[in-house]
Amino acid sequence: MAEFSFSDLEAIIRDRAHSGDPDSWTAKLFARGIDKAAQKLGEEAVETAIAAVKGDRQGLVSESADLIYHWLVVLGLSGVPLSDVLKELESRTGRSGIAEKASRPKG
């Protein structure tokens, strides 16, 4: 069996986004817009951090899955493909994190 990837999840989200399926959480999030999706992303980020601090391995796995899903929803609503994020990450791999951060525009 092939491994499930972020790209697979991105495709599922794209397919369900405008499906009109009343049972689809993805369709509901897209219908509610970026404000609701961003709120959910923030909530999941906090829950992920809490699970990590508590040392709750299963909670961290579960909340991380929620976080990644909601992050991809926000990207989709914003019209930013995952490939753009991956290209940005790739461009940073040849530099130290400190040098990369220093090279970012101020503001």
From Swiss-Prot:
<dbReference type="Pfam" id="PF01503">
    <property type="entry name" value="PRA-PH"/>
</dbReference>
<dbReference type="GO" id="GO:0004636">
    <property type="term" value="F:phosphoribosyl-ATP diphosphatase activity"/>
</dbReference>
<keyword id="KW-0547">Nucleotide-binding</keyword>
<keyword id="KW-0378">Hydrolase</keyword>
<keyword id="KW-0963">Cytoplasm</keyword>
<protein>
    <recommendedName>
        <fullName>Phosphoribosyl-ATP pyrophosphatase</fullName>
        <ecNumber>3.6.1.31</ecNumber>
    </recommendedName>
</protein>
<keyword id="KW-0028">Amino-acid biosynthesis</keyword>
<dbReference type="GO" id="GO:0005524">
    <property type="term" value="F:ATP binding"/>
</dbReference>
<keyword id="KW-0067">ATP-binding</keyword>
<dbReference type="GO" id="GO:0000105">
    <property type="term" value="P:L-histidine biosynthetic process"/>
</dbReference>
<keyword id="KW-0368">Histidine biosynthesis</keyword>
<comment type="similarity">
    <text>Belongs to the PRA-PH family.</text>
</comment>
<dbReference type="InterPro" id="IPR021130">
    <property type="entry name" value="PRib-ATP_PPHydrolase-like"/>
</dbReference>
<dbReference type="GO" id="GO:0005737">
    <property type="term" value="C:cytoplasm"/>
</dbReference>
<comment type="pathway">
    <text>Amino-acid biosynthesis; L-histidine biosynthesis; L-histidine from 5-phospho-alpha-D-ribose 1-diphosphate: step 2/9.</text>
</comment>
<dbReference type="InterPro" id="IPR008179">
    <property type="entry name" value="HisE"/>
</dbReference>
